[in-house]
Every structure is written in C-alpha cells, then in structure tokens.
From Swiss-Prot:
Record's GO cellular component terms: cytosol
Protein name: Bifunctional protein FolD
SUPFAM superfamilies, A to Z: Aminoacid dehydrogenase-like, N-terminal domain, NAD(P)-binding Rossmann-fold domains
Catalytic activity: (6R)-5,10-methylene-5,6,7,8-tetrahydrofolate + NADP(+) = (6R)-5,10-methenyltetrahydrofolate + NADPH; (6R)-5,10-methenyltetrahydrofolate + H2O = (6R)-10-formyltetrahydrofolate + H(+)
Role according to the record: Catalyzes the oxidation of 5,10-methylenetetrahydrofolate to 5,10-methenyltetrahydrofolate and then the hydrolysis of 5,10-methenyltetrahydrofolate to 10-formyltetrahydrofolate.
Species of the source: Pseudothermotoga lettingae (strain ATCC BAA-301 / DSM 14385 / NBRC 107922 / TMO) (Thermotoga lettingae)
C-alpha cells in the first residue's frame, strides 16, 4: 500500500500559492553549492523547477572555495531581497558544518540547520525545524494519528532522526519514540512492534518485510542508487503488508514543497514589518 505523497505535496504548494497572492514582495531563494557533483546539480535543477512553477525567484550560486561560500552566505543573509538560503549537502570533506550553518540568518534558514533554530525546536517552535523532518511529520499527520503510537526511527542524524523524534514527542502529538542507530542491538525485534517506522540510514533495502508488522506506516527517507536506479532504504515488498512512502516521489517531493513554503512565509512576514 503506497502513501500518496504527491497529494500532500500539492496541498502544501496550494498553501504556498495562497501566500504568494498576498505577498507584495516577490519571494527569492538562493541556493549555494561548492564543487557540486552531478547528483547535486540534478537536485538543484529540480528545486529550481519547483520554485519557478510557484512563482518564486530562484538563484543558484556555484562556488569554488570555502571562503567564497562563507562570504556569499553572509551577504545573502544581509540582503533584504533574499527570503531563503539553502546550502547543498554533503559539504566537501574538512568543512565544519556547524560553522557554515551559523552563518545563515536564522530567519532565512529554510533548511533548519542553524543551531539557534535547532534550539528552538526543543521548546516546540517548528517554524524553522529541519525541512526533511518537517516533511516526515507532515506526511505522518496527514495519514494517521501519532498520539500514543509506538514510533521507531532508524537513524539519528541532525536533519532527520533527532529532530523528527523531538517533533513527535511534542505534547500535542505525544508519540512514544524509540531511536535506533548503528549500535542498536537486534533492530528487527524493535521494528516488529512499531506502529510507525521512519528509516533514514542511506542503505538500499535496509528495512525488510519480515521486520515490519501488518498495517504499520513506514516512511522511507533514503535515496540510494542501486543497479543504476533510485532506491529507498526500504525493501519494496514492505508495501504488501504496510503503508509505505514511495522513492522517488515521496519524502523528497514533500521536502521541496516545505522549502518553498518557508520562502513564501518569509516574504509575507517581511511585508508585515
């Protein structure tokens, strides 16, 4: 059973278009990338396509050095015509991710990577929560109630696993959350009891059908290349017994819609200042 993420993405896009009708300023998103590979370039092009389809101005800045990246981020943070800043990841080896994240104006941090926004998340403020975690929670709350449910998150990254756990623990959601990682023993015995499973480990087909109970909701965050094709972290046979987000066309699609929605919200906030 496949979860229809396209309808959720469309719903967010419609919210964005409504915001744009009242914006006096045209929203602008600037994406930064340093020495990008073909995968990054492809993703940024899809981001650009989505932005333009919604009427959001989009600019990609391809940089050659860390110093240029830092300088350009600072300039964009100060530029009143820019409403959202995106920095493509992973960054090249040796670059301090937190150092880069701190340079982004917290109010233009549409990815939710700035440590200040991470801190706000603990107190339930999700305006700039990490965008992929936001997409995961949006999908879940669109298809089921999470209150009291046993949720297992596989992966403890700062962009998905940890923030998703915090968001699902929030009092108005009140899920019971278990986070598994590379040192967790006997993961199958844990996932078999879960009502909801979120998988973000970057390993194609990591979650098998025999690790999932019937009627569970499974959110596949993974994007991997397997035999020349895009594959998720979840074995496709899982959809025979559970509800599963597709890859591609699942979490990634909703995440991009979340990003654009934040740019539009920022522009509308600027109008009211």
């Amino acid at each position: 059973m496949i979860i229809d993420c396209r309808s959720i993405s469309k719903e967010i896009d419609e919210e964005t278009l409504k915001l744009l009708t009242i914006c006096k300023t045209k929203p602008k998103l600037v994406s930064f990338t340093i020495n990008p590979d073909s995968g990054t370039i492809s993703y940024l092009k899809s981001q650009q396509k989505k932005a333009r389809s919604l009427g959001i101005e989009y600019e990609t800045r391809v940089l050659d050095s860390v110093d240029d990246l830092k300088s350009d981020i600072l300039n964009a943070s100060k530029d009143s015509s820019v409403h959202g800043i995106f920095v493509s990841h992973p960054l090249p080896a040796g670059i301090n991710e937190m150092e880069i994240a701190k340079l982004v104006d917290p109010e233009k941090d549409i990815e939710g990577r700035n440590p200040l926004n991470m801190g706000y998340l603990i107190y339930g403020k999700e305006d700039f929560a990490p965008c992929t975690a936001t997409a995961v929670v949006r999908i879940l709350t669109s298809v089921t109630s999470v209150t009291g449910k046993q949720v297992v998150i596989i992966g403890r990254s700062t962009t998905v696993g940890q923030p998703a756990a915090i968001m699902l623990l929030r009092r108005d959601r009140s899920a019971t959350v278990t986070v598994c990682h590379s040192k967790t023993r006997d993961i199958p015995s844990i996932t078999k009891k879960a009502d909801i499973i979120i998988v973000a480990v970057g390993k194609a087909g990591f979650l098998k059908k025999d690790m999932v109970k019937e009627e569970a909701v499974v959110i596949d965050v993974g994007i991997n290349i397997l035999d020349g094709k895009i594959a998720g972290d979840v074995e496709q046979s899982v959809q025979e017994i559970a509800y599963l987000t597709p890859v591609p066309g699942g979490v990634g699609l909703v995440t991009t819609s979340v990003l654009m929605n934040r740019v539009a919200k920022n522009a509308s906030r600027g109008d009211s200042n």
